[in-house]
Amino acid sequence: VVLNVGDTTLTPEELKLRLQPDLVFTHYRHDLHQDHRVISDFTWNTWRTHLILEYEIPKYDGDLGVPNAFVPLGEAIVKSKARILMESFKTQRTKQWFSEDTFLSLARIRGVECNSPQKYAEAFYCRKLVL
C-alpha cells in the first residue's frame, strides 16, 4: 500500500509520528544519482528501526549492484509493473534506458539469479533484517 501523506513539508519526526509502516521502500544507498542517495539517507534516518528494502533503478550510471532479497513475480505482474512505470514517470520517457524492455529484462535477470519458478523477480537490498 502506498500512502499519500498529503503535506510534503512535514519534518522527519512529524512524518514518523503520522506513519507506522511495516515495510519501507527507498532508493538503493549506492545509487549514483545524488537525489536518490539523499532520499535513501533520509529514509534510514527516519525509520531506522523498521524493515527497509532498497530498490534498484536501471539507468546510464551502471550502478546496479548485487541485491540480496528477491520476490518472485509472474509475467502478468511484471508486465503490469513495467506499464505502470511507463505511465507514472512520463518525464523519463525521453531517456534511452527508460523502456518496458529494460524493466522486463532486469526482472528476467533477477528471476534467473533467484531461480524464480515464475521466471521473473524483483530484487532489493536489505541492510538489516530482524527475525
Regions found by a protein language model. Name each.
Residues 1-51, 65, 87, 102, ...:
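Active-site beta-strand->loop->alpha-helix modules in alpha/beta enzyme cores, enriched
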Residues 18-19, 45-51, 55, 70-131:
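C-terminal accessory domains and tails appended to enzymatic cores
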Residues 28-29, 56-58:
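Histidine-centered beta-alpha loop that forms part of the nucleotide-sugar donor binding/catalytic region
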Residues 62-69:
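Flexible "cap/lid" loop of the alpha/beta hydrolase fold
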